[in-house]
Amino acid sequence: LPGARCAYDMTQTPASVEVAVGGTVTIKCQASQSISTYLSWYQQKPGQRPKLLIYRASTLASGVSSRFKGSGSGTEFTLTISGVECADAATYYCQQGWSSSNVENVFGGGTEVVVKG
Protein backbone atom coordinates (compact mmCIF):
# COMPACT_ATOMS: atom_id res chain seq x y z
CA LEU A 1 0.00 0.00 0.00
CA PRO A 2 1.25 3.51 -0.71
CA GLY A 3 2.79 5.00 2.40
CA ALA A 4 2.99 1.64 4.17
CA ARG A 5 6.01 1.20 6.39
CA CYS A 6 8.22 -1.86 6.20
CA ALA A 7 9.57 -3.39 9.39
CA TYR A 8 13.32 -3.84 9.39
CA ASP A 9 15.14 -5.48 12.27
CA MET A 10 18.88 -4.96 12.68
CA THR A 11 20.67 -7.59 14.74
CA GLN A 12 24.11 -6.51 15.90
CA THR A 13 26.74 -8.79 17.48
CA PRO A 14 28.48 -9.01 19.84
CA ALA A 15 26.87 -6.79 22.47
CA SER A 16 30.26 -6.18 24.05
CA VAL A 17 33.86 -7.00 23.14
CA GLU A 18 37.19 -6.52 24.90
CA VAL A 19 40.31 -5.92 22.84
CA ALA A 20 43.93 -5.07 23.55
CA VAL A 21 45.57 -1.96 22.15
CA GLY A 22 46.83 -2.81 18.68
CA GLY A 23 44.32 -5.60 18.22
CA THR A 24 41.45 -6.02 15.79
CA VAL A 25 37.70 -5.87 16.43
CA THR A 26 35.00 -7.24 14.17
CA ILE A 27 31.37 -6.18 14.64
CA LYS A 28 28.59 -7.78 12.64
CA CYS A 29 25.18 -6.46 11.69
CA GLN A 30 22.41 -8.51 10.10
CA ALA A 31 19.30 -7.02 8.50
CA SER A 32 16.03 -8.93 8.49
CA GLN A 33 15.55 -8.03 4.81
CA SER A 34 17.94 -6.97 2.09
CA ILE A 35 18.95 -3.34 2.34
CA SER A 36 21.44 -3.40 -0.53
CA THR A 37 24.33 -1.26 0.74
CA TYR A 38 22.22 1.27 2.66
CA LEU A 39 24.04 0.66 5.92
CA SER A 40 25.92 3.15 8.09
CA TRP A 41 28.14 2.72 11.12
CA TYR A 42 28.35 5.19 14.02
CA GLN A 43 30.63 5.60 17.01
CA GLN A 44 29.22 7.07 20.22
CA LYS A 45 31.11 8.01 23.37
CA PRO A 46 29.42 8.88 26.68
CA GLY A 47 27.94 12.36 26.64
CA GLN A 48 28.64 12.84 22.95
CA ARG A 49 26.55 12.73 19.80
CA PRO A 50 27.04 9.74 17.50
CA LYS A 51 29.84 10.19 14.97
CA LEU A 52 29.34 8.85 11.46
CA LEU A 53 32.16 6.48 10.52
CA ILE A 54 30.99 4.70 7.39
CA TYR A 55 28.05 5.07 5.00
CA ARG A 56 26.78 3.02 2.07
CA ALA A 57 28.31 -0.01 3.81
CA SER A 58 31.93 0.71 2.92
CA THR A 59 32.49 4.43 2.28
CA LEU A 60 34.62 6.12 4.93
CA ALA A 61 33.20 9.39 6.22
CA SER A 62 35.35 12.50 5.98
CA GLY A 63 38.13 12.65 8.56
CA VAL A 64 37.69 9.07 9.75
CA SER A 65 40.78 6.90 10.12
CA SER A 66 41.35 4.20 7.53
CA ARG A 67 41.69 1.79 10.46
CA PHE A 68 37.90 1.57 10.23
CA LYS A 69 36.62 -0.62 7.42
CA GLY A 70 33.07 -1.50 6.45
CA SER A 71 31.99 -4.32 4.19
CA GLY A 72 28.94 -6.31 3.16
CA SER A 73 25.71 -5.97 1.21
CA GLY A 74 22.21 -7.36 1.26
CA THR A 75 21.64 -8.58 4.81
CA GLU A 76 25.15 -9.16 6.20
CA PHE A 77 27.52 -6.34 7.16
CA THR A 78 30.77 -6.02 9.07
CA LEU A 79 32.70 -3.22 10.73
CA THR A 80 36.37 -3.98 11.33
CA ILE A 81 38.62 -1.81 13.48
CA SER A 82 42.30 -2.60 13.09
CA GLY A 83 45.22 -1.31 15.13
CA VAL A 84 42.84 -0.50 17.96
CA GLU A 85 43.69 2.59 20.01
CA CYS A 86 42.49 3.66 23.45
CA ALA A 87 40.42 6.38 21.75
CA ASP A 88 38.39 3.67 20.00
CA ALA A 89 36.69 2.72 23.27
CA ALA A 90 33.04 3.54 22.57
CA THR A 91 29.71 2.02 21.58
CA TYR A 92 29.27 1.31 17.88
CA TYR A 93 25.92 1.17 16.07
CA CYS A 94 24.84 0.06 12.65
CA GLN A 95 21.93 1.84 11.00
CA GLN A 96 19.96 0.81 7.98
CA GLY A 97 19.13 3.82 5.86
CA TRP A 98 17.23 3.15 2.68
CA SER A 99 16.77 6.48 0.90
CA SER A 100 13.03 5.95 0.81
CA SER A 101 10.25 7.64 2.74
CA ASN A 102 8.35 4.40 3.29
CA VAL A 103 11.05 2.67 5.32
CA GLU A 104 12.01 3.44 8.90
CA ASN A 105 15.64 4.14 9.74
CA VAL A 106 16.51 1.42 12.24
CA PHE A 107 19.56 1.06 14.47
CA GLY A 108 21.19 -2.09 15.73
CA GLY A 109 21.41 -2.67 19.46
CA GLY A 110 24.99 -1.44 19.72
CA THR A 111 28.36 -2.99 20.51
CA GLU A 112 30.45 -1.73 23.41
CA VAL A 113 34.16 -1.87 22.64
CA VAL A 114 36.34 -2.01 25.74
CA VAL A 115 40.03 -1.36 25.08
CA LYS A 116 42.58 -2.93 27.40
CA GLY A 117 45.70 -0.80 27.79
UniProtKB/Swiss-Prot annotation:
MF annotations from Gene Ontology: antigen binding
Framework-3: annotated segments: 63-94
Keyword Signal: yes
PROSITE patterns assigned: IG_LIKE
SUPFAM superfamilies linked: Immunoglobulin
Renumbered residue ranges of the record's region Complementarity-determining-2: 56-62
Region (Framework-1): 7-29
GO CC annotations on file: immunoglobulin complex
Alphabetical list of InterPro entries matching this protein: Ig-like_dom, Ig-like_dom_sf, Ig-like_fold, Ig_sub, Ig_V-set, IgV_Light_Chain
Disulfide bridge map: 29-86
Complementarity-determining-3: annotated segments: 95-106
Pfam family, one: V-set
Biological processes annotated in GO: adaptive immune response
Location of the region described as Framework-2 in the Swiss-Prot/TrEMBL record: 41-55
Signal peptide: 1-6
Ranges for region Framework-4: 107-116
Region entry Complementarity-determining-1, spans: 30-40
Keywords recorded for this protein, A-Z: Adaptive immunity, Disulfide bond, Hybridoma, Immunity, Immunoglobulin, Monoclonal antibody, Signal
PANTHER family: IMMUNOGLOBULIN LIGHT CHAIN
Other remarks in the entry: This clone was derived from the rabbit-mouse hybridoma 12F2; the chain produced is a monoclonal antibody against streptococcal group C vaccine.
Name recorded for this polypeptide: Ig kappa chain V region 12F2
Lineage: Eukaryota, Metazoa, Chordata, Craniata, Vertebrata
